């Protein structure tokens, strides 16, 4: 199957891919994957919540929203030294990228210097850096870029026409605007969504269509399977057919051939066999470690054992060529900002 990079995918084309027999879809996705990546290599990231709970948003899936009774206690922003210690542990465990997440609607300018210090110190360990802090303006994005940040994560979560069923405190366009600010300053983007929230296949097509028709495909595409947390509105939602999740991975791989497709939240509930199908469908990145923000993740030892059983190995740092360097028309903006770092 052709792996030409396209930005003009249509909903009809994506529906046709989803409708293929699963063996045929896996074959096509694997063919595209092998044109750009070594199928035996998996990029390994670790995610740390550097500021937990107390978020003012109402995302129906999120245990960190302060309006839901989920048992998550709001905590202050971690000290830089504590974050660096966690990053050292992640590197020793085999991670090549360290992601720092904060439960904010958007960071305040006064928070940026401390986040920037975290980025600089983690970067000095030889790790790639990623942050997910909520909505950013262009000046904040530039400050993070100047500190050495490699990736910024900001998910669109779902399709535009299902979004209002899940979130009311932030508009879909707000998410697209943050992605534009991140691209404008030259940061690599990490952007995906969540499935299993009660959406239909049409909505899953809409999510991938949004990502695959952005001005530049995200460098990383995290595909999250809803982790149902008691106290959140989506607790009790009917679980997604595992084969539908595999189809989601495969269509993401076909439509965004050079992106890292990441198994993210929900992997704790996946069998080894399901994870193998996802790797065969083109997933080539995982979050590694015992916890993703506030929800469980497979233990490091389990992942290491699975890699050994499947003959997989961690991808070395910087083996993935940045999509930002490959995409046409990605012009970095000239920005005049007050000095916040």
UniProtKB/Swiss-Prot annotation:
It comes from the Bacteria. Its cofactor is [4Fe-4S] cluster; [2Fe-2S] cluster. Its EC number is 2.8.1.6. [2Fe-2S] cluster binds at residues 99, 130, 190, 262. Catalyzes the conversion of dethiobiotin (DTB) to biotin by the insertion of a sulfur atom into dethiobiotin via a radical-based mechanism. It catalyses: (4R,5S)-dethiobiotin + (sulfur carrier)-SH + 2 reduced [2Fe-2S]-[ferredoxin] + 2 S-adenosyl-L-methionine = (sulfur carrier)-H + biotin + 2 5'-deoxyadenosine + 2 L-methionine + 2 oxidized [2Fe-2S]-[ferredoxin]. This is Biotin synthase. Binds 1 [4Fe-4S] cluster. The cluster is coordinated with 3 cysteines and an exchangeable S-adenosyl-L-methionine. Coiled coil: none annotated. Residues 40-267 form the Radical SAM core domain. It comes from Xylella fastidiosa (strain 9a5c). Homodimer. SUPFAM superfamilies: Radical SAM enzymes. Pathway: Cofactor biosynthesis; biotin biosynthesis; biotin from 7,8-diaminononanoate: step 2/2. The gene is bioB.
């Amino acid at each position: 199957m052709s792996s030409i990079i396209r930005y003009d995918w249509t909903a009809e084309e994506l529906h046709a891919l989803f409708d293929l027999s699963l063996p045929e879809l896996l074959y096509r996705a694997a063919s595209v994957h092998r044109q750009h990546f070594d199928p035996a290599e998996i990029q390994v990231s670790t995610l740390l919540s550097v500021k937990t709970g107390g978020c003012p948003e109402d995302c129906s899936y999120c245990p960190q929203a302060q309006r839901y009774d989920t048992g998550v206690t709001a905590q202050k922003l971690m000290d830089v030294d504590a974050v660096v210690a966690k990053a050292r542990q992640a590197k020793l465990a085999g991670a090549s990228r360290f992601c720092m997440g904060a439960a904010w609607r958007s960071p305040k300018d006064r928070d940026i210097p401390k986040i920037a210090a975290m980025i600089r110190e983690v970067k000095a360990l030889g790790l790639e850096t990623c942050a997910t802090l909520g909505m950013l303006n262009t000046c904040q994005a530039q400050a993070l870029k100047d500190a050495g940040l490699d990736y910024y994560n900001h998910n669109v979560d779902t399709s535009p026409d299902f979004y209002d069923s899940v979130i009311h405190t932030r508009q879909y366009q707000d998410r697209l605007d943050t992605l534009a600010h991140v691209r404008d300053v030259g940061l690599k983007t990490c952007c995906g969504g969540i499935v299993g929230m009660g959406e239909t296949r049409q909505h899953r097509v809409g999510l991938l269509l949004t990502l695959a028709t952005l001005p530049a495909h995200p460098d990383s595409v995290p595909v999250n399977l809803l982790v149902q947390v008691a106290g959140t509105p989506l607790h009790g939602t009917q679980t997604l057919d595992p084969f539908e999740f595999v189809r989601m991975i495969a269509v993401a791989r076909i439509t965004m051939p050079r992106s890292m497709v990441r198994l993210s939240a929900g992997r704790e509930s996946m069998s080894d066999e399901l994870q193998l199908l996802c790797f065969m469908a083109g997933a080539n990145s995982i979050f590694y470690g015992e916890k993703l923000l506030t929800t469980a993740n497979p233990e490091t030892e389990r992942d290491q054992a699975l890699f050994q059983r499947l003959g997989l190995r961690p991808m070395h740092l910087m083996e993935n060529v940045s999509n930002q360097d490959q995409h046409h028309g990605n012009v970095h903006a000239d920005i005049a900002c007050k000095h916040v770092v």
